[in-house]
Amino acid sequence: MDIDSLNNKLKICFVLPTYNEEENIENIIKQILEEERNQSTDTFSILVVDDNSSDETQDIVKGLISLNQKIHLITGPKKGLGDAYKRGFEFAIDELNADLIFQMDSDGQHDASLIPNFINYIKEGKDVIIGSRFIDGGTTPDFSFSRLFMSKVGNLLVRYVGGITQVKDCTSGYRAIRTSYLKELDFSYLSTRGYSFQSSLICDLAWRGADIFEIPIEFSSRKGGDSKLALRDQIEFLLNIPRLGFRNTKDFIKYSLVGMSGVFVNLGLYTLLTRYYEVSEL
């Protein structure tokens, strides 16, 4: 990799999937643009991928677009987080010519002030930066015991079945990814449409040799609105775990029995816990 090229001015696109985020979307967009104003090296663009929200999300974004041409909006049917990211990645690469793509939640749970840290590590030669809740310094202060338990078990299964034990937080939604790797992705393999797309994506990037680095983040509660994570997303995530092993044959043979049994145990625990606790994003 040409390290000198990493120090040039980058075109950075922030892909923000939305569905009924009228309470949050304007704030996160303004926070991102504020980070651009705080530096003079790179150019930012923001792409909102809206799944036909039934609230005022689209109208709010269109109003912001009228004031700032760095903001873009594409819409489509509600098919899940993974489908939204696939469409967003393609637009960011083909239409916006992005060098670097950020994944961020649109609900205010990710601290935009950390954006410069992500960019600095990319310019040092890393390919993927993950905002991690599960390395030293990372925190989840608002997680209930059940939510933290489910998240850690899910991550453990992905790490070992997928053969990416070096990654501590496989389901984090706060990432920066060099588009040179996204261009190589086999989206037919990444067939998951829901939140399990996040774990499939990071496994695929690792298998392709991407240099992945994690930085600690504090993952706080959403600022407004309701969580979009449904039971079907949790089930898809669990059922997708054994599939990750087929792209990593050596580790799959070693961990397949553990992974398969873990999926069903995890699914049973999830069903039990959801009767008594609020379970949200993995």
PLM regions with names:
Residues E21-R37:
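Short, well-formed alpha-helical segments that are part of the catalytic scaffolds
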Residues G76-D94, A98-L100, Q109-Y195, R222-L238:
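Acceptor/aglycone-binding surface of glycosyltransferases and processive sugar-polymer synthases
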Residues L16, S40-N52, I74-P77:
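Short beta-strand/loop segment that forms part of the nucleotide-sugar
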Residues D50-D59, G108:
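A conserved acidic beta->alpha catalytic loop
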Residues E23-N27, D55-L64:
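Acidic helix N-cap motif at the loop->helix transition within catalytic regions
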Residues M1-K11, I164, F187-Y277:
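Hydrophobic helical membrane-anchoring modules
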Residues E21-N24, S53, L81, D111:
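Donor nucleotide-sugar binding loop of glycosyltransferases
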